[in-house]
Amino acid sequence: METHLYYDTLYQYQGGVYPAHICLPTDVCLPMRVDCIESLYFRCVFFKSGMHYTEWSKLKFTVISREIKFKDVLKDADSDEVFTGLVVMTIPIPIVDFHFDIDSVILKLVYPRLVHREIVLRLYDLICVRPPSNRPSEASAKNIANDFYQLTSRENKQTPDEEKRCLFFQQGPLEPPSTVRGLKAPGNEKPIQFPAHANEKMTESFLSDSWFGQKVRCKKILDFTQTYQVVVCWYELSFSREMQIENNLLSASQLKRVNAADFWDRTNRYLRDIGSRVLTHIVKTLQIHNRQFKQKFNCNFPDNFSFDRLLSFMQLGKDFWILNLTLDSCIIKAIICFLGFQNGGKSFLAQDEVWGDLIDCSKGSVIYGEKIQWILDSTNNLYSTCREKQNKSWELYVDCCALYVSEKLELDFVLPGGFAITGKFALTDGDIDFFNWRFGLS
């Protein structure tokens, strides 16, 4: 766990933070493998006359994408569990007036294609369950005070051959300057020996030597939603063992004014709001065009196809879409791209690509946030769609709808038969405030 060693030493001299050494194992609830994680961010939530959110900060991390057991790396670790993969990191928690009733740490995992997950951890689980402090003796404290970057042998001992060679070691040229090779100087039957200084055996050890032999306590904790597991590591030699952490209790009146689930509640309220606005926008667009819409996607349908069913499919597709709306939705990803591009960010889509939510009305399921490519057929000016792991255009599937949103917030709600309701979604100041708070896009 060199990552924990490095940051434990770094934050010790930086001061003002508590190093929370954690490992994120491969979990069935995560959307992808741990080696697919592109970046990690964290923020803290503290009580300061209300819920106070710190800014998002980027974390450096190490990925172990193989089977690993803590005892194979740390011989005195108290865990025998085998993990199929780990993400190793250290979260620097600022030292403030802690209120363990509601204080928390939010860990954001960013995957390819704007897929992300947030893990909310209680500060109490990260700090207060640590083992009791065992102050090292004065001798051991002196031994580990050296720079851990200095490399030494494990036992600091020399073999007899090495000690013998040291006796004949001398600085200077290999041969005296006046020696002519091939001639034997008279009177010099034996080579002149210059004994080197007496070899002094090193007895001091270094933090890098003792770090992997110390006692380590590993404990699994669950996040706020009881969904994800995180392993917290407490090291015997970590400087945090000597830190005095105080908990400030909240009064009954203060507890009534705060909500420990504020992070999720604000997100769910916004999802309900934007989902309702998208559906309202689709209905108003249909009314503006006098309930007429054109075929935009290449799709064959039977002669006895009933156009009266389209409005029923539209209502059914809207219900399925908003029922389980998540932050992986195409409208969320499109807004992230739109605001990020305005702030000088890069484009996540090619010119012929959009974000899409694919709605299967026959199963009542939705695939959110797919990257969709539009292919124009010049013979009929109709589009076909293509995506990974899909053999044919989504519009060719029976009883299926789709919502497509471009990076310019151009919106298409596609009904069976390839008919589309087209418009452009407009942002409000509330949208910008939410995305700045939730994703740090300011």
From Swiss-Prot:
UniProt keyword annotation of Heme present: no
Signal sequence residues: none
GO cellular component: host cell nucleus; viral capsid
One GO term (biological process): chromosome organization
Family under the similarity heading: Belongs to the herpesviridae CVC1 protein family.
HAMAP family membership: HSV_CVC1
Assembly and oligomerization: Interacts (via C-terminus) with capsid vertex component 2/CVC2.
Name used for this protein in its record: Capsid vertex component 1
Provenance organism: Human herpesvirus 6A (strain Uganda-1102) (HHV-6 variant A)
